[in-house]
């Protein structure tokens, strides 16, 4: 699970790791060419868990929407992809509201990991790199929200210094049931 080496990709670094299962993991900035693979990944993850803001019904974006989003990246708004065997198996985005003077110091983090990549270090490495890039990009605070019964994710976030800052009541509505989410945050 050690960092093998880094390769500069424009101003971003592509990082490579060996995971607990012996596979090589590459983490890098998402590129336009990833649009279709990202949608496949996101829809797969949505079928595997009810902890995301979308589920088996699918993600409501198409390839062109995803390309447009990728083209809009800035140091405060970006998405990292985690790739194993040329397949995107996880993603992590940070988005700041740069158009709002009083909010542009703060980003919102979202992470999506396919089931086959659970428990092997992918989420940890994505979080490390995303928080590093958020700080480099000028953010001073990162927030996220997580379903209150997603204990594994909450544990990961707490390991990274996130603290519970509040609760969003009835945040998710899944199969006729409302679920609350915690708001968690940390300084970077």
Spell out what each predicted region is.
Residues 25-37:
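A short beta-loop-alpha structural element at the N-terminal edge
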Residues 40-57:
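Helix-loop element at the rim of GNAT/NAT acetyltransferase active sites that forms part
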Residues 2-13:
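Short, Lys/Arg-enriched N-terminal segments with co-localized hydrophobic residues
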Residues 143-146, 158, 163-179:
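Conserved catalytic-core motifs of GNAT/GCN5-like acyltransferases
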Residues 20, 58-116, 127-128, 187:
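Acetyl-CoA-dependent GNAT
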Residues 127, 134-145:
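Conserved GNAT acetyl-CoA-binding A-motif
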Residues 30, 113, 146:
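Hydrophobic adenine-recognition pocket in adenosine-nucleotide-binding enzymes
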Residues 127, 150-153, 170-175:
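Short glycine/proline-centered loop/turn elements that form peptide/ligand docking sites
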């Amino acid at each position: 699970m050690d960092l093998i080496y880094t390769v500069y990709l424009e101003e971003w670094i592509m990082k490579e790791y060996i995971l607990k299962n012996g596979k090589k993991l590459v983490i890098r900035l998402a590129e336009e060419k990833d649009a279709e693979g990202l949608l496949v990944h996101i829809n797969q993850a949505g079928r595997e868990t009810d902890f995301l803001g979308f589920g088996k019904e699918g993600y409501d974006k198409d390839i062109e929407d995803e390309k447009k989003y990728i083209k809009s990246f800035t140091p405060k708004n970006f998405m990292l992809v985690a790739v194993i065997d040329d397949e995107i198996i996880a993603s992590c985005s940070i988005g700041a509201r740069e158009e709002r003077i009083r909010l542009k110091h703060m980003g919102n983090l979202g992470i999506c990991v396919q089931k086959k990549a659970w428990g092997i270090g992918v989420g940890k490495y994505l979080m490390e790199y995303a928080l590093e890039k958020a700080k480099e990009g000028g953010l001073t605070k990162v927030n996220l929200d997580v379903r209150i019964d997603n204990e594994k994710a909450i544990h990961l976030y707490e390991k990274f210094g996130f603290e519970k800052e509040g609760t969003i009541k009835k945040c998710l509505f899944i199969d006729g049931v409302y679920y609350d989410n915690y708001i968690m945050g940390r300084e970077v």
